[in-house]
Amino acid sequence: MSQKIDTSELVVDFVGGAVGHRFRSGEGRGQALAKAAGLTRDATPEIVDATAGLGRDAFLLASLGAKVTLIERSEKMHALLAEGLARAAEEGGRYAETVARMTLLLGDSSLLLPDLKPQVVLVDPMHPPRGNSALVKKEMRQIREIVGTDPDAERLMQVALEAAQNRVVLKWPLRADPMVGLRKPSHQILGKSTRYDVFVKAKLS
């Protein structure tokens, strides 16, 4: 029987820590995530983050000017996100401007995406623990305790590929095998521990 993880300390924080640092550093649209999502000097697509989690990717994209809809099906994680967004908005300035471009929804992305018809969909499934779970960051263990794994990730990707107007981005472990059942991505953008499999349907304008 697996040990239950204490999630009471988990907080969604867009102001401090790594997120706040990235926000203040102003790395811009040259970052891997931004490039994968199609943000360029001439294009700022509307994006749906279909697996919101802690909302960090969505916040980064919104800070770069994109309108981002976050979908989270876990009620507890949705509540943590709502609290984090409210705290960021209270900071005012660029934080408030960024939050104003974000819309948080509670629900199943597979059901919501067809009606939203977004330009870009970002999918970042929760992966089963690999190797010794003690080596996995505490925060990630807490998130997994709340949202579980995503055994329906392939189905979500298929729905996303149908619903997206322009592209779907799958955030995936760098050295992991491709997700079963998907066609070959149009291209990949590689990070230090993550890769973005990009499935292009139409050019962004």
Swiss-Prot record:
Location of the protein in the cell: Cytoplasm
Keyword set includes tRNA-binding: no
Record field: catalytic activity: guanosine(1516) in 16S rRNA + S-adenosyl-L-methionine = N(2)-methylguanosine(1516) in 16S rRNA + S-adenosyl-L-homocysteine + H(+)
Any single Gene Ontology cellular-component annotation: cytoplasm
Keyword NADP: no
GO MF term set: rRNA (guanine-N2-)-methyltransferase activity
Similarity comment: Belongs to the methyltransferase superfamily. RsmJ family.
Protein name per UniProt: Ribosomal RNA small subunit methyltransferase J
Organism: Brucella anthropi (strain ATCC 49188 / DSM 6882 / CCUG 24695 / JCM 21032 / LMG 3331 / NBRC 15819 / NCTC 12168 / Alc 37) (Ochrobactrum anthropi)
Gene expressing this chain: rsmJ
